[in-house]
Swiss-Prot record:
Keywords: Isoprene biosynthesis, Magnesium, Metal-binding, Thiamine biosynthesis, Thiamine pyrophosphate, Transferase. Its EC number is 2.2.1.7. Belongs to the transketolase family. DXPS subfamily. Its cofactor is Mg(2+); thiamine diphosphate. It is an enzyme of class 2 (transferase). InterPro entries: Dxylulose-5-P_synthase (IPR005477), THDP-binding (IPR029061), Transketo_C/PFOR_II (IPR009014), Transketolase-like_Pyr-bd (IPR005475), Transketolase_BS (IPR020826), Transketolase_C (IPR033248), Transketolase_CS (IPR049557). It catalyses: D-glyceraldehyde 3-phosphate + pyruvate + H(+) = 1-deoxy-D-xylulose 5-phosphate + CO2. It comes from Prochlorococcus marinus (strain NATL2A). NCBIfam families: dxs (TIGR00204), PRK05444.2-2 (NF003933). SUPFAM superfamilies: Thiamin diphosphate-binding fold (THDP-binding), TK C-terminal domain-like. This is 1-deoxy-D-xylulose-5-phosphate synthase. The lineage of its organism: Bacteria, Bacillati, Cyanobacteriota, Cyanophyceae, Synechococcales.
Length: 628
């Protein structure tokens, strides 16, 4: 069968193992061809090709529901569910999304982008199914890294308490998340991975017992108990945790053997109640470079398929904000042993891998456990440690209660560095960092700031670490502005003090963080129309520099705020609220992300669609204030 001609995943039914293996080769070929050209997640999807094929040929996907955790490993799922011919548009504007979206396909039953949600969603569907008296299978596919997340463990705890609710959890164990997973549970899974497989006593034996004259039915329950005891005695450690939590455990199964996977899934479907099938896979399977470097090939920009090397940018770029942060933190840690960097399974993305390599004693990876990371940092701060929690803006949302309850209310000196703040591009709405300005500015005792460039980032990092209270700074994805960097001798900024960059009498433009340089470029465009602007780098949103901003607003009389975040409760709202509270009534234009989701596209395309380019912002300003 040609994969390009597959119109429905149910067409896998009845194919011979050799034919299914050929489909697997075609999936890998298409997967590699597209990702090498346009970029995307590589290793996760390559590792679940056989798992996906085997699972889908045991299901009726017109009715059965499969929930993929995170979604970055679901490229084979997309190729099997009608998106083969559009797959060239992967992660491109108006193309196939890099994650799962309910609006994209009827086979995407639950959207995702963050980890550890699949078991909860699948269990919810299973409970709804049973309440409605319907009959279909609910399956969650979750990676071993995501299983360290508290939400996944909460769902397992609940599901195990529902012995009459059929639910299949497929544990895709590739011994990795993005980087190697950490923690006792990961160690346990690794030990299980190398243990002999545990399967069921065959259906025929159970049927024979049931058919014994006079007593077959009577000893059915005792037989089930005996079966479990025999399995535990045979291999006492394998699956014991899941069995004790109420799951029937099967595995570990070779995740690249379609025949064995098919037999196991068929057996699992016959069990009533929650079942855990443990599948051992290899991340990056089938592409030697990805198998050899599973961290580096988790996700890739465009690369040469023959050599495995990334295709370099045509124009050299300054270091990224993330890299500057990581390098600066290493230097600060060298000077102060009390500083500790904390990540939640995102060492490479946040550049804390630099600290991990340089000073491992001052580095902590808690796994996919953002809530724990925040409160862990709070506990450290209580004892005189200076924790720096580096985390994506979108992932810090998962620990909002901890920010308020454990850090803010207690006024604990913890530094939060929010990476990927603002528009992130091809990862789409689940990963846009558009909400942190709003959700941080209302938390008691927090000081919140954003640098205009990488040099100011260095100063703000020192400011946060030296501050005797909770603080947060946001940095955008991508390269910096090329500002000169200092190797040492950084000084703290005055908290709550803005910076006036340009003086003009016709318009006041206040930029926050990554929008400061676009504000300067917008002012230059307006100058061509005779509009002279004062441009202020706000630096801080909490506390806001009311003295500087109020004086300029009253003097000039026309105000524009610019931010790379949602307008609802954002930086512009903070400025307008401050004006209102102080009886300053001046016309104000707030520019930022409107009340809408930002879909996957390049960052530049997203900014164009939102009206956030200097040219488009200049047009908005001219229309608002009648600058002709």
């Amino acid at each position: 069968m040609r994969l390009s001609q597959l119109s429905h995943p149910n067409e896998l039914h009845g194919l011979a193992i050799s034919e299914l293996e050929d489909v697997a080769c075609q999936i890998r070929e298409r997967h590699l061809q597209v990702v090498s050209t346009s970029g995307g997640h590589l290793g996760p999807g390559l590792g679940v090709v056989e798992l996906t094929i085997a699972l889908y040929q045991t299901l009726d996907l017109d009715v059965d529901k499969v929930i993929w955790d995170v979604g970055h490993q679901a490229y084979p799922h997309k190729l099997l569910t009608g998106r083969y011919n559009r797959f060239d548009s992967l992660r491109q504007q108006k193309g196939v999304a890099g994650y799962l979206k309910r609006t994209e396909s009827k086979f995407d039953h639950f959207g995702a982008g963050h980890a550890s949600t699949s078991i909860s969603a699948a269990l919810g569907m299973a409970i709804a199914r049973d309440r409605k008296g319907e009959d279909y299978k609910c399956v969650a596919v979750i990676g071993d890294g995501a299983l360290t997340g508290g939400m996944a463990l909460e769902a397992i705890n609940h599901a195990g308490h529902l012995p009459k609710t059929p639910l299949l959890v497929v544990l895709n164990d590739n011994d990795m998340s993005i980087s190697p997973p950490v923690g006792a549970l990961s160690t346990y899974l690794n030990r299980m991975r190398h243990s002999p497989p545990v399967q069921f006593i065959s259906d025929s034996v159970q049927e024979s017992v049931k058919n014994l004259p006079f007593m077959g039915d009577a000893i059915q329950e005792e037989f089930k108990s005996l079966t479990g005891s025999v399995r535990r005695l045979a291999v006492p450690s394998v699956g014991a945790v899941f069995e004790e939590l109420g799951f029937t455990y099967m595995g570990p199964v070779d995740g690249h053997d379609i025949a064995e996977l098919t037999r196991t899934f068929n057996a699992a479907h016959k069990v009533g109640g929650p079942v855990m099938v443990h599948v051992a896979t290899t991340k990056g399977k089938g592409y030697p470079y990805a198998e050899a470097d599973q961290v580096g090939y988790h996700a890739q920009s465009s690369f040469d398929l023959t050599t495995g090397k990334s295709i370099p940018s045509k124009t050299p770029k300054p270091p990224s904000f993330s890299k500057v942060f990581g390098q600066t933190l290493v230097k600060l840690c060298e000077q102060d042993s009390k500083i500790v960097g904390i990540t939640a399974a995102m060492a490479e993305g946040t550049a804390l891998n630099l600290l991990q390599k340089a000073i491992p004693d001052q580095y902590v990876d808690v796994g996919i456990a953002e809530q724990h990371a925040v409160t862990l940092a709070g506990g450290m701060a209580c004892e005189g440690i200076k924790p720096v929690v580096a985390i994506y803006s979108t992932f810090l949302q998962r620990a909002y209660d901890q920010l308020i309850h454990d850090i803010g209310i207690q006024n604990l000196p913890v530094t939060f560095v929010l990476d990927r703040a603002g528009i992130v591009g091809a990862d789409g709405p689940t990963h846009q960092g558009q909400y942190d300005i709003s959700y941080l500015r209302c938390i008691p005792n927090f000081t919140v700031m954003a640098p205009k460039d990488e040099s100011e980032l260095q100063q703000m990092l020192v400011t946060c670490i030296n501050h005797n209270g909770p603080s947060a700074l946001r940095i955008p994805r991508g390269s910096g502005e090329g500002a000169a960097l200092m190797e040492e001798g950084w000084e703290s900024l005055e908290i709550g003090k803005a910076e006036t960059l340009e003086e003009g009498e016709n318009l006041l433009i206040i930029g926050y963080g990554s929008m400061v340089f676009p504000a300067i470029r917008t002012a230059a465009i307006l100058k061509e129309f005779g509009v002279n602007s004062t441009v202020i780098n706000a630096r801080f949103i909490r506390p806001l520099d009311e003295d500087t901003i109020h004086e300029a607003a009253k003097r000039i009389g026309k105000v524009v705020t610019m931010e790379e975040g949602t307008l609802l409760g954002g930086f512009g709202s903070a400025v307008v609220e401050s004006f209102n509270d102080n009886d300053i009534f001046v016309p104000t234009l707030r520019i930022g992300i409107p009340d809408k989701l930002v879909d996957h596209a390049t960052p530049q395309q997203s900014k164009e669609s939102l009206g956030l380019t200097p040219e488009m912002m200049a047009d908005q300003i001219r229309n608002k204030f009648n600058f002709n």
